[in-house]
Amino acid sequence: MVFGYYAAAIGRAFFPTKNEYASLMLSLMTFGTGYLMRPLGAIILGAYIDHHGRRKGLLLTLALMAVGTLSIGIMPGYETIGFFAPLLVVLGRLVQGLSAGVEIGGVSVYLAEIATPGRKGFFVSWQSGSQQVAVIFAALIGLTLSAVLRPEEMAGWGWRIPLLLGSMLIPFLFMLRSSLAETDEFIARKHRPSTSEIWRTVMTNWRLIILGMMLTTTTTVTFYLITAYMPTYGGSVLHLTAKESMLVTLCVGISNLCFLPIMGALSDKVGRRPLLILFSTIALITPYPVLLWLVSAPSFGRLLAAGLWFSMIFGSYNGSMVVFLTEIMPVNVRVSGFSFAYSLATGLFGGFTPAVATWLIHETGNRAMPGLWLSFAGLMGLTATLVLTAPGFKHGAHQSGRPVDAVHELPVG
């Protein structure tokens, strides 16, 4: 996330060119490259978690994330080590991507399996809620740094501070995860599938994986548009101050944190389907008009209003989407299947949202074009929801031939 916030500064440090657009694009493409590793992480680490347990897997993913984040934070720039600088930064992003490929799935499934009956949506929503805490933390640091550092200091070394501060939290997170108990549902399972069995089951359910990817695309594109890309869009495109852009990002993170548990709890009451259909439709129809209104007279107030509107879409859709994805996956490969679908969406669509948005604006000259990218994501989510909740569509474990238990516990529509 921090990488996306400071893409322009990181681009100048590791990808120096005479063309500012080229430098920014190289940085954003490196940001996106980490997401290409997520499907691989979902396969390898997801299988590990489905076989060895949730707790062990969450410790492993945290260790990998720590290595990737710290390596980028301490990496010398291009002027110091030349070609090795961008090469090693890309490597750090790949390690981050490998870990992140199963982080969301591992935590979401853990929360789903420890949730009390009838409150699964509320419990699982806190996985995404924890991401918003990171967004808020990064934005607060960004606001502080922009207030005390000159622009040249921020570009030279200030962007490293959030990465290093984030790395300092790792020991605390290790202690927290080490204290977690394994879920009763996993302990009760008599059969622990091998990696080959897990991969075979995932591939057998390829249609479910594709639909899960489409379902998740709405979430990932919206999230990275309003968080990772927001500071770049506000500063480089709308020419607002860094303080204004980061303040909007902070407000968006707080708004996300409010909407997610509320809508997760609401999905426990009314079902996942109505909320998914409603907010994917809003994501399809409203983004371009909202951004067109914003760019017609750019201001802090309008950027804040647009950001909060998209935050409402993200929080409301994601509050029911993540738990729904845990419910439709085959039981024995719940982490692997969830993570693979989620990682495909992030790797192919969400992670490259900042780069795609920048390219669309550069090629067309239309600063509202990112809205069409978000509308495309909304269409993906709406289509997947209608198919997955259609009468007769079967979810669940291929091996057992029955739907995932959670689908029966809670109403889908």
Model-derived segments and spans:
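Helix-to-loop junctions at the C-terminal end of transmembrane segments
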Residues: 42-54, 260-271
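C-terminal transmembrane helical hairpin of 12-TM major facilitator-type secondary transporters
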Residues: 274-320
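Hydrophobic core of transmembrane alpha-helices in multi-pass small-molecule transporters
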Residues: 81-101, 300-316
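Extracytoplasmic gate region of multi-pass secondary transporters
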Residues: 3-4, 206-255, 349-354
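C-terminal ends and interior cores of transmembrane alpha-helices
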Residues: 16, 63-81, 281-297
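Glycine-rich segments within core transmembrane alpha-helices of 12-TM secondary carriers
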Residues: 122-146, 341-353
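Cytoplasmic membrane-interface "Motif A"-like loop-to-helix N-cap segments
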Residues: 51-63, 269-280
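Extracellular/periplasmic helix-loop-helix junction of adjacent transmembrane segments
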Residues: 6-38
